[in-house]
Amino acid sequence: MLNKLFGRVVSGKGEGKHYMSLPPYKEKFKNILGFEPYEGTLNVKLGYIINLNELNPIEVDDFYYKNNKYYGVKLIPVRICIKDYCVNGAIVYPKKTEHPNNVIELIAPIKLRKYLSLKNNYMVKIRL
């Protein structure tokens, strides 16, 4: 069974910040993952395509907030590592996304770029 992924940090569109700031997502993620996520995501481009559904994701249903529909996501708890330092986090796999199949979004209770000193093209290891 697959137990780790490797990929390189890439820039996103900044949309993760908006979604991660919504109270319903924050509350659901805190209940499921045990932490309130930082308001943003880290995009990582894998060197291959994987089927995230094979990794037993936890599903979060669609919901309405302030008269707008928000689509559900799938979560996979992970450890995000750079060298020997790791942080608890999760892969967030939105039902509706514009990312190619080999780009994943990561969340954590901290700003990963800052606390892991990450820049575009840095290699990260994701422990499943």
UniProtKB/Swiss-Prot annotation:
Biological process per Gene Ontology, one example term: FMN biosynthetic process
Pathway involvement of the protein, from the record: Cofactor biosynthesis; FMN biosynthesis; FMN from riboflavin (CTP route): step 1/1
Cofactor binding, note field: Binds 1 Mg(2+) ion per subunit.
MF terms (GO), sorted A to Z: magnesium ion binding; nucleotide binding; riboflavin kinase activity
Gene3D superfamilies, A to Z: Riboflavin kinase-like
Domain of life (superkingdom): Archaea
Matching Pfam families: CTP-dep_RFKase (PF01982)
Entry keyword annotation includes Ribosomal protein: no
Keyword Transferase recorded: yes
Binding site for FMN: T97, E105
Binding-site positions, CDP: G12, K13, G14, E15, G16, K17, I110, K111, L112, R113
SUPFAM superfamilies (alphabetical): Riboflavin kinase-like
The protein's required cofactors: Mg(2+)
Family stated for the protein in its record: Belongs to the archaeal riboflavin kinase family.
Role of this protein: Catalyzes the CTP-dependent phosphorylation of riboflavin (vitamin B2) to form flavin mononucleotide (FMN).
HAMAP family (alphabetical): Riboflavin_kinase
Name under which the protein is recorded: Riboflavin kinase
Organism field: Methanococcus aeolicus (strain ATCC BAA-1280 / DSM 17508 / OCM 812 / Nankai-3)
Gene name of the encoded protein: ribK
